[in-house]
């Protein structure tokens, strides 16, 4: 039986792998899907601190030669560092709205967004539920009605101890030299995220796609995103 291409899916903030990638389940017919729950997310325990560079180290255990990596949001920042650390193991890299706003510093939309995020982290509510509501509005994610589940509240607590992704010094030189193809995806809902994705496209020599309709969580579109990702991965598999 022919081996399926290996696809490592790296989730972002607030929700775990199961919730982040629920619309990608059909891809299991075409790929070997590996979607770990990062530390601090259900069903695991709370953590005291999250750092995207440390997460990249932790994610190395899921790499095998020829792995395709796709990361959403904070997981996209982690994936950029992972790919730079172990380029010899990657066959392709896809990032979906990584909040590496530092790369777009000087672009007004990104600067304004960073200011609002920093204000929320510094002076926003300390109650996890209220902190999460404010965060979801800022990034353009949907806000559940009613009370948050215990799982979402744990995700909120983890969010509050994340190292700000705007601090990320993306290893552009290493990534640009890496021979595998790159894809940068955004949801067409935010000038700030578009600014980041535009810089990544240029500096990485990446392909670029915009899929509107699901805000920040582009993968929740399901089939349109799945076909984009599958086509990109299958092209990367070609000799």
Regions found by a protein language model. Name each.
Residues 32-68:
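Active-site loop/oxyanion-hole signature of alpha/beta-hydrolase fold enzymes
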Residues 69-71, 96:
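Short beta-strand immediately N-terminal to the catalytic nucleophile in serine-hydrolase-like folds
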Residues 204-239:
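Catalytic active-site module of serine/aspartate enzymes centered on a nucleophile-bearing elbow/loop
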Residues 148-213:
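Conserved serine/cysteine hydrolase catalytic core
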